[in-house]
Amino acid sequence: MNTWKKELSFIFVLLLVAALTACGSTNEETNGEQSGAGTEVSEEEITIAQINWAENIAVTNMWKVILEDKGYDVTLSLLDMGVTMEALATSEIDLSLEIWLPVQDANYLETYEDTINFSESTWFDNAKVGLVVPTYLEEVNSVEDLNEHKELFDGEIIGFDSGAGTMEVTEQLIEDYNLEFELLPSSEPAMIAAIGQAIENEEPIVSPLWSPHSVFSNYDLKFLDDPQKTFGGVEKIHHASRLGFEEDHPEVSEWLKNWKMDDEEIGELIDYVESAEDPLDGAKEWIEENQELIGEWVK
C-alpha cells in the first residue's frame, strides 16, 4: 500500500535540482550576468526572495517583469521561508511577496515585527489553508476523523518546506487534536508529486495545502473540516520589505500597496507561468494580456 512513498525521497531530490534552474531568474544567474558589467551597484537594484511554491514563483516573476520594464534591475533569490525572514531582517534582500496572515505566518510577524516592515496592504484576500485528502475518501471529512483512520494513512501527513508557517501550524494542529500522526517535510513540488502519485493509484494521502493553488485544477481534493479553527478562517496575503525600503524606493512601495488580485487572476497567472518553458516568459505573456490591471497598480 502507498507505493508512492518509496519514491518520495528520490522525487524530492530530482525536484530540488530542477527548482534551482526552473524558477525564473535566480541569484546565481543574475550574478553571472553582472560579472561582465563591472562592480558598480545601481541604486535601482532590487532583490526579491523567491520561494519554491507555485503562486510565489508566479508573482515573483510577474513583479520582475513589471519592475524591469520600469528600469529596475531585479534579482530573484531562491530561499526558503525561514531564510527569507532572516535575510529581510538583516537587509540582505529587499522584498518578500508572500506573507500569510493572521494565522499561517503569525510566528514570523511576532519574531521580526521590529526588524522587518510587514505591509498592512494585502494583494489577495480570500486565501484558505487546511489539510486536504482526495475526494474519493468519503469516510474522511474532518480532522477529527483522522485518528480513526490512522492505519489508512500509515500515520503520516505528507508536508512540504519545514520552515513554512503552514507547517508550523500543522504541527500545532497535530497537538490540538491529539493526532497520532507524524508530519513529514519535503518540498512543495515533492508533496504535489506525492499527491498526484497517490491519486493515480487511488491510494489515501493527507497533506497541508492552500488555495489559491493550481493543484485543485488538476486533482479532486477536499479540505478537511477544522472545528477548532487551528488553521484559522480566511487568510490574507501581504508583502514585507526590509527596513528602509520604502524610503529608498517610494514609487515601488506604492505600486506594491496598489497590487490586488482575485482568484481568477492569480489562477490564470499561475497557469501561464507553469505552462511556459521559462517562468519569466509565462509572466511576460500574462502581463501583455492584462495591461489594464497592471496599470491600476503602477499608476
Give the role of each language-model region.
Residues 18-22:
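C-terminal motif of bacterial Sec signal peptides marking the signal peptidase cleavage site
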Residues 53-54, 75-87, 184-194:
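Short helix-initiation/N-cap motifs at beta->coil->alpha
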Residues 24-43:
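Short, low-complexity, disordered segments immediately C-terminal to signal peptides
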